[in-house]
Regions:
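Surface-exposed, charged secondary-structure patches
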Residues: 139-181, 232, 236-238
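Extended hydrophobic
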Residues: 175-204
Length: 238
């Protein structure tokens, strides 16, 4: 799983190069030598806020942009961690959690992993498993991300969304040294209109199904003792 998650973030590399090119173009000297009037600072700030709001709305409405955005943010977290304090795992995991929280529906994923056991679990057990599941996945994710080596990732398909569509698979290809690995994010649209990641499949391995089977096996092995299954989940399942 670590190998799978470490490759997810590298899609940001190509985007970073494009951003650098755009920055270089923006820095070219203007031929207009006439002094320009200074803009009102409040208007500049207002304009920036409006632009940021529009970009945020676009990302929420477009699942493809959402996947790219979370990847770019993770790349920045990795760079910052490596350059400032590479031994502080607690701070790194906290930064990863901050990035993933708006994009990944951990509650939905935990619900699917528990399967039918969610119906017999108490509210406290469901809440505790969601927390344990999220924290364990983030730590595994974070350690995997630190091993990425700039593998090339391309968007394999970006078909137009149909009206009313609330589920889509964002497909990518991870180009390694000698092999191409297919990657697919399952994205679901919430009632708020926001697209969230609810599952990942890499090279034919469905993360959600794999973890659900592990939860089922652990519950059956331990006489359906959900408290034990939940408390030991981080060490056994991820």
């Amino acid at each position: 799983m670590i190998a799978m998650l470490s490759l997810v973030a590298t899609i940001g590399a190509a985007q970073s190069d494009q951003n650098n090119d755009a920055t270089a173009i923006a820095k070219r000297p203007s031929v207009d030598i006439k002094p320009k009037p200074k803009l009102d600072q409040s208007k500049q700030t207002q304009g920036l806020l409006i632009t940021e709001a529009l970009v945020s709305a676009k990302i929420q409405e477009d699942p493809f942009s959402r996947v790219e955005q979370v990847t770019l943010e993770l790349i920045e977290v990795i760079k910052s961690h490596r350059n400032t304090n590479p031994t502080n795992e607690k701070s790194f995991f906290s930064a990863i959690r901050k990035v993933l929280k708006p994009h990944v529906d951990f509650s939905y994923m935990a619900k699917m992993v528990m399967g039918s056991y969610r119906k017999i679990a108490t509210n406290e057990q469901r809440d505790e498993f969601t927390r344990v599941f999220r924290d364990g996945l983030i730590e595994t994710y974070g350690r995997g991300l630190l091993s990425f080596n700039n593998e090339k990732i391309i968007l394999a398909d970006q078909s137009p969304l149909k009206k009313g569509q609330n589920k889509v698979y964002v497909k990518q290809e991870i180009h390694g040294l000698d092999k191409i690995y297919p990657l697919s994010y399952t994205m679901r649209k919430k009632k708020t209109g926001k697209w969230m990641i609810t599952n990942v499949t890499i090279n034919g391995i469905n993360l959600g199904k794999t973890l659900r089977n592990q939860f089922l096996q652990s519950a059956q092995k331990n006489s359906n003792d959900l408290d034990f299954v939940i408390s030991s989940w981080a060490n056994q399942a991820i």
